[in-house]
Amino acid sequence: MNWLEPTKIFIVFCFLLYACRLDLKARIVPNRVWKLMLVATIPITAYQIYEVAILNRTILFLALFGVIFIVLLAYLLYRMNAYGGADAKALMCLAVIFPLYPDFWGFPIINKGFGIFAFSVLSNSVIFAPIMMFGLLFRNLIMEGPRGFLKTPLYYIAGYRIPIEKIHFHNLFEFLDEKGNLKRVRRAVEPSEEMISRLKKYKIEKVWVTPALPFIIFITFGYAIAIVFGDILFFLLSMIL
């Protein structure tokens, strides 16, 4: 039984979880995290490439194309401000570490998408947002009741109400202005210390917020789904078309 692939998958998953923790805590992921992840996994990848080269060199050219494609795509999305630098580096590293789609013990269960693993991770990451929206809607209908949904449907699908002391790592859908008037916005704003102090001053217990989750969390989710199931977006499109 070949344990190289699952070992590499586990190592990368641990690094991604660590990156999520750092991003949530300090909003920054040092470059050394990605360097260490490459150092820990490249020996396995190099050996796997050597094995493939003996059997079929054509696959190597396809793998090289996939790596170049993802590196360029990740950089382009970063330049377009679609996500942060850490997210781009994570995708680039995944492209290098997994030039071939990992296939072991019957996984992935559904498919391999277009055969470019990092691309499947990215597409899975994107569909996590609507899934989270349905989860928030279900939660809010139970916790807040259906009546409020008619007044503020956006808040029901994109946020939730929390106590003031738990605002950390959330953006505000509602806050108090300088005169103490309650303001509600469609685009959540990052809370300042002044905003938080004002809410406490007027003894506001709860406000509507949206989670300010770093995209690396979505990437980690997409990674796990790509390993176990495959490319979900590719599967959905194949069912429709």
Which residues does each predicted region cover?
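A membrane-topology feature that recognizes alpha-helical transmembrane segments
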Residues: 1-241
